[in-house]
């Protein structure tokens, strides 16, 4: 299998980007992402919504912002062993050691903001990405999504998984849980990237555009106890990651209350019906 790499004229660009990479490169972060993976997979009932042929041999799949490669390693079991699976991320520190990876899985370093390898253009039957676009403003989403769409071969599919973290689907009562949306709107450049994604897909001529929207219930009213445990952990992690970066004044509450936010957040999940909306969007490049 051909080894793909991306080089830059100024090597410091990639190093600077790594320094600003949002994810902590350690085992705790890998465990957080694996829990999130299982939560989204279990909630939506699977990994792939695009109607790709799971039995066809010699297909190529690209996973953008692959992190530790969890999605790619999991989806591998759905396809024949001849399937080519490539994942890329800006920082390779989370990648499993090369000797532990299946032969048809390749993890490389590339930067969505700097451009992708020319040999990827029109190459992939499925291009997948999740939990990336909230970090970008609409114009950057347009630029990045354009690069990913170029990687889809004629007749192939792109699939995007994103939260709608800025939308309240829990009602007004769980005021501490609603802090999640306040933090999202404070820190995310696009707390609800759904509409921008759909508009860009339409504008660029992709067809068979579909969206599955799911309000994933968390806490007391989630009947599936495993999904409840995974969802609560994922929400706690999200709030814990954002909370230290904002002051009590920005939250509009006394410091004493701010110190107890995480406990009250947990209590709201146990008392009220709380949920977070996520979407999966998939679309096809015309033949």
Curated annotation (Swiss-Prot):
Keyword Methyltransferase on entry: yes
Family membership noted in the UniProt record: Belongs to the methyltransferase superfamily. LaeA methyltransferase family.
Enzyme's top EC category: transferase
Its job: N-methyltransferase; part of the gene cluster that mediates the biosynthesis of 11'-deoxyverticillin A, one of the dimeric epipolythiodioxopiperazines (ETPs) from the verticillin family that act as mycotoxins. 11'-deoxyverticillin A is required for normal conidiation. The nonribosomal peptide synthetase verP is speculated to be responsible for condensation of amino acids to form the carbon skeleton of verticillin, whereas the cluster-specific tailoring enzymes are involved in further modifications leading to the production of 11'-deoxyverticillin A.
Domain of life, per lineage: Eukaryota
EC number: 2.1.1.-
Sorted UniProt keywords: Methyltransferase, S-adenosyl-L-methionine, Transferase
Coiled coil start-end: none
The protein, known as: N-methyltransferase verN
Species of origin: Clonostachys rogersoniana
GO molecular function, one term: methyltransferase activity
Entry's Gene Ontology BP terms: methylation
Expression induction or repression: Expression is regulated by the cluster-specific regulator verZ.
Disruption phenotype: Completely abolishes the verticillin production.
Protein's gene: vern
CDD domains: AdoMet_MTases
Metabolic or biological pathway, per its Swiss-Prot or TrEMBL entry: Mycotoxin biosynthesis
């Amino acid at each position: 299998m051909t080894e793909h790499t991306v080089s830059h004229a100024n090597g410091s660009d990639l190093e600077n980007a790594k320094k600003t990479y949002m994810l902590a490169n350690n085992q705790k972060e890998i465990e957080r992402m694996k829990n999130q993976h299982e939560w989204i997979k279990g909630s939506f009932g699977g990994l792939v919504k695009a109607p790709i042929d799971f039995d066809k041999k010699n297909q190529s799949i690209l996973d953008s912002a692959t992190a530790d490669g969890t999605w790619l390693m999991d989806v591998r079991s759905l396809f024949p062993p001849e399937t080519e699976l490539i994942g890329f991320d800006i920082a390779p520190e989370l990648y499993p050691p090369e000797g532990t990876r299946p032969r048809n899985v390749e993890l490389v370093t590339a930067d969505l903001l700097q451009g992708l390898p020319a040999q990827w253009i029109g190459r992939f039957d499925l291009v997948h990405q999740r939990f990336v676009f909230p970090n970008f403003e609409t114009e950057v989403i347009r630029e990045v999504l354009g690069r990913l769409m170029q990687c889809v071969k004629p007749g192939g599919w792109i699939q995007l998984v994103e939260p709608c973290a800025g939308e309240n689907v829990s009602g007004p009562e769980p005021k501490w849980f609603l802090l999640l949306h306040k933090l999202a709107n404070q820190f995310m450049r696009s707390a609800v990237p759904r509409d921008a994604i759909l508009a860009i897909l339409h504008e660029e001529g992709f067809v068979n555009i579909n969206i599955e929207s799911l309000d994933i219930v968390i806490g007391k009213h989630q009947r599936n106890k495993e999904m409840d445990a995974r969802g609560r952990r994922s929400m706690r992690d999200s709030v814990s990651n954002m909370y230290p970066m904002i002051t009590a004044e920005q939250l509009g509450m006394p410091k004493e209350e701010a110190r107890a936010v995480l406990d009250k957040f947990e209590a709201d999940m146990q008392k009220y019906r709380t949920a977070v909306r996520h979407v999966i969007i998939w679309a096809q490049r015309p033949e």
